[in-house]
Curated annotation (Swiss-Prot):
GO molecular function annotations of the record: ATP binding; ATP hydrolysis activity; ATP-dependent DNA damage sensor activity; damaged DNA binding; single-stranded DNA binding
SUPFAM superfamilies reported for this sequence: P-loop containing nucleoside triphosphate hydrolases, RecA protein, C-terminal domain
Source superkingdom: Bacteria
GO process annotations (BP): DNA recombination; DNA repair; SOS response
Keyword DNA damage among UniProt keywords: yes
Protein name, per record: Protein RecA
Binding site for ATP: G68, P69, E70, S71, S72, G73, K74, T75
Subcellular location: Cytoplasm
Alphabetical list of Gene3D superfamilies matching this protein: P-loop containing nucleotide triphosphate hydrolases
Family affiliation: Belongs to the RecA family.
Cited CDD domains: RecA
GO cellular component terms listed in the entry, alphabetical order: cytosol
NCBIfam families from the UniProt entry: tigrfam_recA (TIGR02012)
């Protein structure tokens, strides 16, 4: 017992010395209530994706990456997170490195564009410095960087068109993330990096796809979402949206590799009513008999599109279903925008 007591005194002395040198809380025992701390989250605006992420949304104080092919819904998903943060009274910033943000589309997704901070930086270093200053302010809830591929190093912009700049962007991302990750972890800010896909040349086995900006973001990101279009959604012959699949390829705080599918409607973003309808059918809250959908003995419509339209025209019923689904999965209720039937 004497050896154990001596070892305990030694570690207590070391802990006291570390706290004097680095401040209170620099080191602690993991069992001191840490396991009961709930990770604060922001909803993605898509209940099925919130469930797939395992904690009810995207984590605050963490880095997240959304990547996929062109026009797959990357920016749409990020803007939905911004809208959800604003509904909770939070502030958001959009670093538009691509100089391509559609303000009218953002407004249709529920983003309060009047309150959205936007920056269109001239080069990559400037974009990441802006992100760091915003994180350090500890006043921003969500920062979206769109996109990593557009974070062009200053040396490349100032050089000639044909000059070789091997590894410049990867070094920029690696250096910036080393600085950013510490600031982000001490804040309540979720930083979302949107990334594009490139093809590796000469790959014989495995996927030839890779993301831009080197490997640093893959390591530092708490969550990585791979978003893809599955197929078109048609109204008669007219294509009105896309069926979209998201795979959680990395998740440090819940089981990864979960997949979800939902509708993305042109001009409206993620179809909340379609997502809740699918989850309600899966859970048994809505009965599906043949092509008919029913809830508590009341018919919602024949066919999925008619049932979706019924829910869209009856926001109270939609809210009731979402509340039940969230309660069943122990998630806090986050009401969506109430849209009129004719919108």
């Amino acid at each position: 017992m004497g050896a154990v007591d001596e070892r305990q005194r030694a570690i207590d002395t070391a802990v006291s010395q570390i706290e004097r040198m680095c401040g209170k809380g620099a080191i602690m025992r993991l069992g001191e209530g840490a396991q009961n701390v709930e990770i604060p989250v922001i909803s993605t605006g898509c209940l099925s994706l919130d469930l797939a992420l395992g904690i009810g949304g995207v984590a605050r104080g963490r880095i997240m990456e959304i990547f996929g092919p062109e026009s797959s819904g990357k920016t749409t998903l990020a803007l939905h997170v911004v809208a959800e943060a604003q509904k909770l009274g939070g502030l958001a910033a959009f670093i538009d490195a691509e100089h391509a943000l559609d303000v009218n589309y953002a407004r249709k997704l529920g983003v309060q564009v009047e309150d959205l901070l936007i920056s269109q930086p001239d080069y990559g270093e400037q974009a990441l410095e802006i992100a760091e200053i915003l994180v350090r302010s500890n006043a921003i809830d969500v920062i979206v960087v769109d996109s990593v591929a557009a974070l062009v190093p200053k040396a490349e912009i100032e050089g000639e068109m044909g000059d070789p700049h091997v590894g410049l962007q990867a070094r920029l991302m690696s250096q910036a993330l080393r600085k950013l990750v510490s600031s982000i972890s001490k804040s309540r800010t979720c930083v979302i990096f949107i990334n594009q896909i490139r093809m590796k040349i000469g790959v014989m086995y495995g996927s030839p796809e890779t993301t831009t900006g080197g490997n640093a973001l893959k390591f530092y990101a708490t969550m990585r979402l791979d978003i893809r279009r599955v197929g078109p959604i048609k109204d008669g012959q007219e294509v009105v949206g896309n069926r979209t699949r998201v795979k959680v390829v990395k998740n440090k705080i819940a089981p990864p590799f979960r997949e979800v599918e939902f509708d993305v409607v042109y001009g409206r973003g993620i179809s909340r009513e379609g997502d809740i309808l699918d989850l309600a059918v899966e859970s048994g809250a809505i009965e599906k008999s043949g092509t008919w959908y029913s809830y508590s003995g009341e018919r919602l419509g024949q066919g999925r599109e008619n049932a979706k339209n019924f829910l869209r025209e009856h926001p109270d019923l939609l809210g009731e279903l979402e509340r039940k689904l969230r309660e069943a999965h122990n998630l806090r209720f986050s009401p969506g925008p109430v849209t009129g039937a004719g919108e």
